[in-house]
Amino acid sequence: MPSKRGGSGGLDIGLIFAHKILTVLFILSTVGWIVAFIGQCAAEADGVGRQGVLWFAIFLQLFLIIGKYLGVMSDSLGTSRLQLTAFTAVALVFSVFGINSGIYSSNSADEAVAAGWFLITIANVIWLLFLTTEEDSVLYPIVNIANAGITPPAARTSSRYNGAGGAGSGGQSMRMAGSGGVGTGLGGGYGAGNGSAYGGFQGGSGYQPAYGNSPSAADITTANGTGLGAPKISSASIRSRGANDAGATQDAPSVASHGAPASPAQVGSKSTDLPDYGYKARALYAYQANADDPTEISFSKGEVLDIVDNSGKWWQARRSNGETGIVPSNYMQLL
């Protein structure tokens, strides 16, 4: 899988034209920058007026334009969203100063400066809306109305982080429709405040074993190593504080005195049948799984996946190579 969400991890100049609104913004900002720069040079040469701080502004705007070009061509605007937003806001203030410096002047060079900065101001305002609009906003479908392949900057953030920590909803809220999860019987389950309740995949910011023999999230895997379905617990996963802790429930896997793992029959006794993948969905964008979350899977743009259930923000999916895991629903389109 690629290391970036944009596909091959390289630069694709065709992506500049994949989002029609961004294409117009690039034209406005590039033409505006050229006009403003030539106007400032002419104004300085004529000795009509010193441009002063506008020289800083013009080069700040140049670096922003280049950075946005690179971000779009690599489809990585989401990774630099905060930096681009901050510097675009600063550049917007300077662009207004640029308009004010020459709009009332009778000198043609100053008028060119004002005209150039006016085009840049329009581009900066729309860029700020594009970079800061979240998926739940009414502006989101508007700023992405002509998008034919660019990953929206807010897509990854809002699909993975859906609230603060707490009982039942953590920093990484995951929903997996399907069965085969681990119940509350594993060593008494996890703590309510920082818990990670597997089987519904409502994950908290972390977990604390309430009792002695609780396995870690990374140790709960299936035979195919995907982290879904019935648990398979190795001897290294046992956090032992006592052979027969009072908090262990009847559903907890038995552990021998020498730390041997429970038999597959004992561990899988509570598991259910394999989930039915009744839907198919095509990936609208490429996605790289979070390295800290073993339940997520990566996929490429245009890839078709099998889906268990199409409800919720995270879907249980299976790739063509048999790999299973959860995927963000806003990256998928049902077929």
UniProtKB/Swiss-Prot annotation:
The chain crosses the membrane at residues 21-41, 53-73, 84-104, 112-132. Plasma membrane osmosensor that activates the high osmolarity glycerol (HOG) MAPK signaling pathway in response to high osmolarity. It is a multi-pass membrane protein. GO terms for biological process: actin cortical patch assembly; regulation of actin filament polymerization. The keyword Transmembrane helix applies. Residues 276-335 form the SH3 domain. Residues 1-20, 74-83, 133-335 are cytoplasmic. Belongs to the SHO1 family. This is High osmolarity signaling protein SHO1. It comes from Mycosarcoma maydis (Corn smut fungus). PROSITE patterns: SH3. Pfam families: SH3_1 (PF00018). The keyword Transmembrane applies. It comes from the Eukaryota. PANTHER family: ACTIN CYTOSKELETON-REGULATORY COMPLEX PROTEIN SLA1 (PTHR15735:SF19), FCH AND DOUBLE SH3 DOMAINS PROTEIN (PTHR15735). Forms homooligomers. Residues 42-52, 105-111 are extracellular. Its main location: membrane. It is found in: Cell membrane. GO terms for cellular component: nucleus; plasma membrane. Residues 238-272 are annotated as: Disordered. Keywords: Cell membrane, Membrane, SH3 domain, Stress response, Transmembrane, Transmembrane helix.
